[in-house]
Curated annotation (Swiss-Prot):
pH dependence: Optimum pH is 8.5.
One GO MF term attached to the UniProt entry: exo-oligoalginate lyase activity
Family: Belongs to the polysaccharide lyase 17 family.
EC number in record: 4.2.2.26
Substitution effect: residue 208 to A: Displays same catalytic activity toward poly-GlcA as wild-type
Organism of provenance: Stenotrophomonas maltophilia (strain K279a)
InterPro entries per the UniProt record, alphabetical: Alg_lyase, Alginate_lyase_dom, Chondroitin_lyas, Hepar_II_III_C
UniProt-annotated site: Neutralizes the sugar carboxylate group at subsite +1, residues: 207-208
Gene Ontology cellular-component annotations: periplasmic space
The name this protein goes by in its record: Alginate lyase
Length: 742
């Protein structure tokens, strides 16, 4: 017979007990003591509901069984609380991670099953920490300004506390007063005090500080320490300059976009939502989920929208294989669904194949059992950046559903220290794959052999550098000369964004990335009946105050099929492209002579062909390069890129079209549609506007007009081969059918 949770048994037994008069007079004091130790992060009533109903719902029952199996293996292996010695990925580091996971699981399973073995296991582990923690100073492998105690960086200490305090809250009323006092006075309280005492970590607007304030705030609620809660909410000085509330106000845009990008939005989401949940349960009058028009719940939706094929857009410092199945977003989906009842989130939960053993997780399980899931609608959107939404944004253009075409134009803020120097960078996805790529971060997370799992030196020398991205490089220097603090002061200006059924377009201007240089990028995702799939049109206009070298890389995924230009190759030697700012990591494989006529490059990826037609207003070289040079430790992936180079110009315009087409099936041995349906790309300059014309094999012409001044509503005209294109406003789609002279 399954045991009931202990608190359920006590609740049922109390009304039937025959107590002497003296005991009755002591009842209020006993009730007060019980209230002082009762769980507060998840209430006793909520635990009781999960214990009595959870196994009736397959998703919840499966998660509970998985957690039980995992924890029993840990319990069988015995308790191990080692003296901290290692970096990330090392034995002691990984053991302390397993320990906080075990503490959380033990507390949860005690409440769901009533089995005292889980209490004993968690208690004994925490008592060992009570012996260890007072002896610890800065970690011997300490990283950064503030080493941790249990871990090499203080961030991991915060993560430990966020998880462990939840497990402790669940067993606290099952412990003796002596054990509670030992554990709290020697583990949880000194841990929280250590975090609060380090303002360089605690009083910051950054994801590290989010974890710290969530840890101390949740600990404050459990220990009934309102002073600690107030410091967590308002900063260590309680002056509202820092703390959890200020972080909500400054780190998210009104749309729910997080400044550091999707990868770190994913990481920060867990402490934001877990602490917000604790605040809502203990101080509902704060209305934390309503703050800034519900921005925390918006952030969950935005994070899912910032993904393709289940993986997050890897902008800034990002690990490529992080996606919607991460544990942080599992928590986010559960909490957001419980607060909103948005059935679209249930389809994300189905993809995650997991849920939390929490009241929110139970609600998800109940809804899934009732078949309430609806498809999540991935749609085009402009996610404004900055606290007031006026510091650029992330433009997402989409057609043909979840695995169709997605174009991402990165017109965002710098992203603090995790930001890359890639203003107006872009990515493109199609057929379930990244096609125009972003390297992400140079890091092997928690792989000890790769420098302990930290960001590698190549993250700074390659991955952050501008040439590692698909945007303008001037004189082989990175944006803001590679200084992120300078980058924080300057953001792109979004010119316009529009998304219709057949035309989706985004445009932004960047100034001050280079002294005296301004550049504007306009990109469109265009559908046409004579094309099999939507195409990407790209227009990059550069204006400088002196002659310079302009490089425009395109990092792509696939195997080159044809190069539509003559080039010099280097079969006997492989020159390195440059000496610094990322160029030292590029091998030069082929180089064309300068020319102004549009050229092409075609490649094959996962059974689909891609033809890239490109040109420029001034003579340009086409260089084929590959990453991986000057990499003696083999830390970099070998990836191809095309680099257009214009020398000695003040102004230049780059224009291109990327066309997905055809099918290759090696198993069935057939090829369809290997030839591009676009015959020519033509760029024509007018007095105050440009027209890019795509001339199709069918005879039809796709034309896009773009005005220099996006604010104007006046008429613009550009003549192309005797045909006058006219439109009003910032831009217009101006197609012509075969034989159309109008």
């Amino acid at each position: 017979m399954r045991l009931q949770p202990l608190f359920v048994s006590l609740a049922l037994a109390a009304p039937c007990a025959l107590l002497p008069t003296a005991s009755l007079s002591a009842a209020p004091a006993a009730a007060a003591r019980q209230a002082d130790t009762a769980p507060v992060l998840v209430t006793a009533a909520q635990w009781q509901q999960m214990a009595s109903e959870g196994r009736r719902y397959p998703w919840f029952a499966k998660e509970q069984a998985r957690t039980e199996a995992t924890l029993k293996k840990m319990m069988k292996a015995g308790i191990d609380v080692p003296v901290p010695r290692d970096k990330g990925g090392g034995r002691t580091h990984e053991q302390h991670k397993r320990n906080y996971q075990a503490l959380l699981a033990a507390g949860t399973l005690y409440r769901l099953t009533g089995d005292r073995a889980y209490v004993d296991y968690a208690r004994d582990m925490l008592l060992q920490y009570a012996q260890l923690y007072p002896t610890l100073g800065p970690h011997p492998e300490g990283r950064g300004q503030i080493p941790g105690r249990v871990f090499w960086q203080v961030l991991n200490d915060s993560v430990w506390l966020v998880n462990a305090i939840q497990g402790y809250d669940a067993i606290r009323d099952a412990l003796s007063a002596e054990d509670r006092n030992t554990i709290e006075s020697k583990v949880f309280r000194p841990m929280a005090e250590f975090l609060v005492s380090e303002p360089k970590n605690y009083d910051q607007i950054h994801n590290h500080a989010t974890w710290a304030v969530a840890a101390t705030g949740m600990t404050g609620y459990v220990l009934r320490d309102q002073e600690l809660v107030e410091k967590s909410l308002r900063g260590s000085q309680k002056d509202d300059k820092f703390g959890f509330l200020r972080q909500i106000d400054l780190l998210f845009s009104p749309d729910g976009y997080y400044e550091e990008g999707p990868y770190y939005q994913r990481y920060a989401l867990a402490p934001f939502l877990l602490f917000a949940n604790a605040i809502e349960r203990n101080e509902p009058q704060r209305k934390i989920f309503a703050r800034r028009d519900g921005v925390l719940l918006k952030a969950v939706d935005v994070l899912v929208q910032s993904s393709y094929g289940g993986l997050f857009f890897p902008i800034n410092d990002a690990i490529l294989d992080k996606g919607i199945d991460t544990e942080e977003l599992v928590a986010g989906i559960g909490i957001a669904y419980a607060r909103t009842g948005d059935d679209r989130l249930l389809s994300v939960a189905e993809q995650q194949k997991r849920l939390l053993l929490s009241p929110e997780g139970l609600q998800v399980a109940q809804a899934l059992a009732a078949n309430k899931a609806k498809p999540f609608d991935y749609h085009p959107m402009l996610l404004r950046d900055g606290p007031d939404g006026d510091r650029g944004g992330l433009a997402i253009l989409r057609m043909n559903g979840e695995r169709g075409q997605a174009l991402v134009q990165k017109d965002t803020m710098q992203g603090m220290g995790h930001g890359h120097f890639d203003k107006l960078n872009w990515l493109f996805y199609d057929n379930g794959n990244p096609v125009v790529t972003d390297y992400g971060a140079a890091r092997f997370l928690n792989v000890e052999a790769k420098r302990g799992g930290i960001y590698l030196a190549e993250n700074r020398s390659w991955a952050k550098q501008t040439v590692a991205h698909n945007t303008l490089v001037v004189d082989e220097q990175s944006h803001f000369n590679g200084n992120w603090k300078r980058g924080e002061a300057h953001a792109p200006q979004v010119r316009f964004f529009q998304a219709d059924a057949d035309t989706q377009i985004a445009s932004a201007t960047m100034r001050d990335a280079y002294p005296g240089v301004a550049f504007t990028r306009t990109q469109a995702l265009l559908r046409h009946p004579d094309l099999g799939l939507p195409v990407v049109l790209d227009l990059l206009q550069v204006h400088g105050d002196k002659a310079a070298r302009y490089d425009l890389p395109l990092h792509f995924n696939g195997h080159i099929v044809t190069t539509g230009f003559e080039a010099e190759h280097f079969p006997s030697q492989r020159p390195v492209l440059g000496k610094d700012n990322g160029y030292q990591h590029l091998w030069l494989d082929a180089r064309s002579k300068p020319g102004s006529e549009p050229r092409s490059l075609a490649w094959l990826l996962d059974g689909r062909f891609y033809t890239y037609r490109f040109g420029s207003s001034a003579p340009a070289q086409a260089l084929l390069v590959e990453s991986g040079a000057n990499d003696p430790e083999f830390n970099l992936r070998r990836e191809p890129a095309l680099l257009q180079r214009v020398d000695g110009q003040k102004d230049v315009t780059f224009f291109s079209v990327l066309e997905p087409h055809g099918e290759y099936n090696g198993t069935a041995e057939y090829v369809h549609g290997a030839d591009s349906r676009i015959r020519e790309i033509v760029r024509t300059r007018g007095s105050d506007a440009e027209v890019i014309e795509l001339r199709l094999a069918s005879g039809a012409r796709i034309a896009l007009g773009v005005a220099d001044n996006s604010a104007t509503t006046s008429e613009h005209s550009v003549t192309v081969d005797g045909h006058v294109y006219r439109w009003n406003g910032s831009h217009a789609r101006l197609d012509r059918s075969k034989g159309d002279g109008k």
